[in-house]
């Protein structure tokens, strides 16, 4: 138990691990997180989701102040962004060029919103999405028919992207 004193930070991936389903924590997990915080450990929620889609069941835990979101591109403290890693428009074009001959599903995070290929949103199972996340995927993603053109046409930096 003395080794627990050496732990300073716990980063918890949410989807498919910490969460019982797409939005809730089990009572046991909730209690364990609260216990860690009370013992002085910084607990960080981490997710591919944008911050606005982080579940209240996690973000409302007193003392859980930090979140790493948008596939690691955004760090927030108490709901305010403290760091963002952006993909510049020229780099977006390079990425699109690198996969131009591949049948890939593209997803982009822009200012807290998620945009995804309509094929992924309508048929998430075909692209590896777990059934318990279908509703989340369908509800939070902007449905774009031609993601390549959409991403190539934006004149702002992406917060994050996924292939």
Language model: regions and residue ranges:
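Asp-based phosphoryl-transfer active-site loop
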Residues: 6-23, 95
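Active-site phosphate-binding/coordination module
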Residues: 27-131
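Acidic, His- and aromatic-enriched active-site or binding-groove loops in soluble protein domains
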Residues: 123-147
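C-terminal cap/substrate-recognition subdomain and adjoining C-terminal extension
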Residues: 139-163
């Amino acid at each position: 138990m003395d080794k627990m004193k050496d732990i300073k930070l716990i980063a918890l991936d949410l989807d498919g691990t910490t969460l019982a389903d797409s939005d809730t924590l089990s009572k046991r997990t909730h209690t364990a997180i609260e216990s860690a915080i009370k013992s002085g450990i910084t607990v960080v929620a981490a997710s591919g989701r944008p911050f606005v889609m982080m579940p209240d069941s996690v973000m409302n835990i007193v003392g859980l102040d930090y979140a790493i979101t948008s596939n690691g591109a955004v760090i927030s403290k108490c709901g305010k962004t403290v760091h963002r890693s952006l993909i510049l428009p020229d780099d977006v074009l390079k990425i699109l060029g690198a996969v131009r001959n591949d049948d890939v599903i593209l997803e982009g995070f822009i200012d807290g919103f998620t945009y995804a290929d309509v094929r992924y949103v309508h048929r998430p199972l075909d692209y590896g999405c777990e059934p318990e996340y279908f509703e989340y995927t369908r509800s939070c993603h902007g449905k774009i028919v031609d993601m390549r053109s959409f991403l190539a046409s934006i004149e702002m930096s992406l917060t994050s992207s996924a292939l």
